[in-house]
Amino acid sequence: MPCKRCRPSVYSLSYIKRGKTRNYLYPIWSPYAYYLYCYKYRITLREKMLPRCYKSITYKEEEDLTLQPRSCLQCSESLVGLQEGKSTEQGNHDQLKELYSAGNLTVLATDPLLHQDPVQLDFHFRLTSQTSAHWHGLLCDRRLFLDIPYQALDQGNRESLTATLEYVEEKTNVDSVFVNFQNDRNDRGALLRAFSYMGFEVVRPDHPALPPLDNVIFMVYPLERDVGHLPSEPP
């Protein structure tokens, strides 16, 4: 019996899957404790009628990993991050887009099309023509968690944090900025004094916005917002 159907049928399905998975290169209290991923799948079905009416079906699936966590050789307070950052820094940098640049501060963020909760933000502050200070953070539910850079008490890092806080206050709708460090650090007292001087406050361990961790000190910089406040350039 001849086949009445001569044209091939093509069916295509595309969908995006987002989520996070544990990044064991960083401790659980770090903003980079999880990989953020965004997979794009495309499944194509081709149906072709052969002389005896048998079906030939082909499936094609494409997977695109579009987002991974940042690891920076210059910036990470984690020793593992310092060791591993060199090999991944360039690849991760390519996944960030410039969001803002003025004076010595440049802000990078994940692709706006991939924005989800949380969102990755990087703050680069130029100190000289060849050096810069970096603060890497995750924006989650109007809270910004900053990773403390290596040698956080250096004058350059303090200047860069001031510029970062000014940007966050003026250009975003963030309500609180968090930093954290180990309770048993040798420079714990110096960190407490330095961040307190800049307006940070120690957060109680049972604060609902924090993970239930031991031996970790969280400090928060609260931003007082006026009613009806709208950021001029939201991330």
UniProtKB/Swiss-Prot annotation:
Keywords: Cytoplasm, Nucleus, Phosphoprotein, Polyamine biosynthesis
GO annotation, cellular component aspect: blood microparticle; cytoplasm; cytosol; nucleoplasm; nucleus; sperm flagellum
Any one GO MF annotation of this record: ornithine decarboxylase inhibitor activity
Organs and tissues of expression: Testis specific.
Free-text function comment from the UniProt entry: Ornithine decarboxylase (ODC) antizyme protein that negatively regulates ODC activity and intracellular polyamine biosynthesis and uptake in response to increased intracellular polyamine levels. Binds to ODC monomers, inhibiting the assembly of the functional ODC homodimers. Does not target the ODC monomers for degradation, which allows a protein synthesis-independent restoration of ODC activity. Stabilizes AZIN2 by interfering with its ubiquitination. Involved in the translocation of AZNI2 from ER-Golgi intermediate compartment (ERGIC) to the cytosol.
Protein family per UniProt: Belongs to the ODC antizyme family.
Name this protein carries in UniProt: Ornithine decarboxylase antizyme 3
Organism: Homo sapiens (Human)
Phylogenetic placement of the source organism: Eukaryota, Metazoa, Chordata, Craniata, Vertebrata
